[in-house]
């Protein structure tokens, strides 16, 4: 195989996107959500992993957290990995990391990325399904379960446990 053949082969491979987010909670266990201005529903702080620059999912979650809410935090363990099929885009592998607990000073320090976000709020577990649409809602609930029961990373497909 020549170099050109190999390049053509690589270009022909299926495309998969990667996203990463941080799951932050307050002392009451409420989850920090952000409201994007470019789509319906709410989300965790996070976004697309810039894999073309060599960024890893963990680095992407930390970078996006800093960009979106102004907090630069070392992230904890990987809570969930979710393979998500979506309309009008390639599949995405979504990583959720433990962002840890936010105290009052952390909450006061939040500065939204106004070009992408409208607002933020803390949401109780029982209210998450009305804020987080589709697989994202299931993913966040599964990540909270991992934190609560101390189990290892959960594997998901479209927000549902597998294996």
Residue ranges and their predicted role:
Residues 36:
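Short loop/turn segments immediately following the C-termini of beta-strands
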Residues 142-163:
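Charged phosphate-binding loop/patch that engages nucleotide di/tri-phosphates or the phosphate backbone
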Residues 30-31:
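Hydrophobic "anchor" residues
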Residues 49-74, 82-136, 162:
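Unchanged
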Residues 43-46:
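A short gly/proline-enriched turn/hairpin at secondary-structure junctions
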Residues 1-21:
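Acidic, metal-coordinating catalytic segment for phosphate/diphosphate chemistry
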């Amino acid at each position: 195989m020549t170099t050109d053949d190999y390049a053509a082969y690589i270009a022909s491979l299926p495309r998969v996107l990667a996203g990463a987010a941080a799951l932050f909670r307050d002392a009451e266990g409420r989850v920090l959500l952000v409201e994007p201005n470019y789509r319906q529903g709410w989300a965790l702080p996070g976004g697309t992993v810039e894999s073309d620059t060599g960024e890893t999912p963990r680095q992407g979650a930390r970078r996006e957290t800093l960009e979106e809410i102004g907090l630069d935090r070392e992230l904890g363990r990987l809570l969930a990995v979710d393979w998500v099929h979506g309309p009008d885009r390639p599949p995405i592998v979504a990583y959720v990391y433990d962002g840890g607990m936010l105290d009052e000073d952390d909450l006061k320090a939040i500065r939204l990325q106004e070009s992408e976000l409208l607002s933020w709020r803390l949401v109780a577990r029982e209210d998450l399904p009305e804020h987080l649409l589709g697989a994202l809602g299931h993913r966040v609930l599964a990540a909270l379960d991992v934190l609560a029961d101390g189990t290892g990373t959960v594997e998901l497909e479209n927000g549902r446990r597998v294996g």
